[in-house]
A protein has these predicted regions:
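Beta-loop-alpha module in the N-terminal Rossmann-like domain of NAD(P)-dependent dehydrogenases
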Residues: 30-90
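Glycine-centered tight turns that cap/initiate beta-strands
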Residues: 7, 44, 121-124
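N-terminal Rossmann-like dinucleotide-binding module
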Residues: 1-28
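Alpha-helical elements of Rossmann-like donor-binding domains used by nucleotide-donor carbohydrate transfer enzymes
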Residues: 23, 38, 47, 59, ...
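Acidic-histidine catalytic/liganding microenvironments
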Residues: 5, 42-43, 107
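Predominantly a Rossmann-like dinucleotide-binding segment in NAD(P)-dependent oxidoreductases
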Residues: 97-99, 104-171
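Hydrophobic alpha-helical segments typical of transmembrane helices
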Residues: 1, 9, 20, 35, ...
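Short, Asp-centered acidic motifs that coordinate Mg2+ and/or phosphate
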Residues: 12, 46-47, 127
Length: 171
């Protein structure tokens, strides 16, 4: 997606798997690395996007933060409170911005719901509830990291974020 945005310049990509980085280098004509610290040491990077599997966000996040780079982490920030607290503590220590990509906030239907709830005539919401009614087959056999995450992490987290956003409060 970054290659489609005229306001971004994809500088480098890092993945532990050399086969993946070789394919990306050829497909996107971009420098690739298999070590995040090497990439951060050698490239002029304004910000880092972290799109590792859910349970593996912490190490690249901490590396980028320690290099003073703001990060955008695919949701969820972490799969444990301990990892999330470590990331946020380091971000505070290094005065680095951390953002989590809760992209449902940009869906037109979600924006309409929030706007309606912000309307004075709607009153003040006192309770939030969301349900994902669709039967979604999560292809856990495709993910070699599936045992380290769950649908709550990669799907349910949207519900928590939307309730918080809709109601203007922390959950």
């Amino acid at each position: 997606a970054y290659t489609w945005n005229p306001n971004t310049n994809l500088v480098a990509v890092c993945d532990l798997n050399k086969e993946i980085t070789d394919r990306i280098a050829e497909q996107y004509n971009v420098k690739t690395y298999n070590d995040v610290n090497e990439m951060l040491d050698n490239e002029e990077i304004d910000a880092v996007s972290i799109a590792t599997p859910d349970a593996f966000h912490m190490d690249p996040a901490l590396a980028a933060i320690r290099h003073g780079k703001p990060i955008l982490v695919e949701k969820p920030l972490a799969t444990t409170s301990e990892d999330a607290k470590k990331i946020l503590a380091e971000a505070e220590k290094y005065n680095v911005r951390v953002a989590v990509d809760y992209h449902k906030r940009w869906d037109p239907a979600a924006i309409n719901v929030r706007n309606e709830l912000q309307n004075e005539e709607s009153g003040t919401p006192i309770r939030g509830y969301m349900c994902m009614d669709d039967i979604i087959d999560v292809p856990t056999e495709w993910f070699n990291w599936a045992d380290k995450s769950s649908p709550v992490h990669f799907l349910g987290t949207h519900c928590y974020d939307q309730i918080r956003w809709y109601m203007g409060c922390e959950v």
